């Protein structure tokens, strides 16, 4: 049990996919203008990443490896992720049409979110078993959601701040993301 807790902490805080591995930057910058949207995107990505990790493991170990078709991993994982995203999109549209409209184009873009594909491929490269794959996907999604919501809160505060004209918009957002990355570097060495 301790191994799984350390895997979640390590994936969410120490090896964060956005701030350390630079995966998932498109939704990180695009959806982080309002906290409500960031929370919705974080929850949707959390569900997709966890389920996609499970499905990718099952497809890889029960279809691709027995058929000696591991060279198709990237393509097959993209298809698996697309199916999971479509399922998530239909569920959100049915349960919360307002959130569905708020997320807009970013919900289908989870399919092309490199963090989701990165987690699936890293699970294979790190030779995780089924439980570790799901926990790794959950930890990665937890870290993604945490960073997304924190960054959205910072960006909402930046709107009211007196920022020089040359730094407004994307410039101050990137500087803030860099400072946030430095803050997360403080977690390095937390887990041995």
From Swiss-Prot:
| Superkingdom per UniProt | Bacteria
Q: InterPro entries, alphabetically?
A: Ion_transpt_RnfA/RsxA, NqrDE/RnfAE, NqrDE/RnfAE_oxidrdctase
Enzyme class, UniProt record, top EC level: translocase
**Where does it reside?**
Cell inner membrane
Any stretches that span the bilayer, and where are they? 5-25, 39-59, 63-83, 102-122, 134-154, 171-191
Q: Provide a GO CC annotation, any one.
A: plasma membrane
What is the membrane topology here? Multi-pass membrane protein
Q: What is its EC number?
A: 7.-.-.-
Q: What does this protein do?
A: Part of a membrane-bound complex that couples electron transfer with translocation of ions across the membrane.
Q: Which family does it belong to?
A: Belongs to the NqrDE/RnfAE family.
- Oligomeric and partner information: The complex is composed of six subunits: RnfA, RnfB, RnfC, RnfD, RnfE and RnfG.
Please name the NCBIfam families in this protein's record.
Answer: PRK05151.1, rnfA
Q: What is this protein called?
A: Ion-translocating oxidoreductase complex subunit A
Which species does this protein come from? Haemophilus influenzae (strain PittEE)
Q: What is the gene called?
A: rnfA
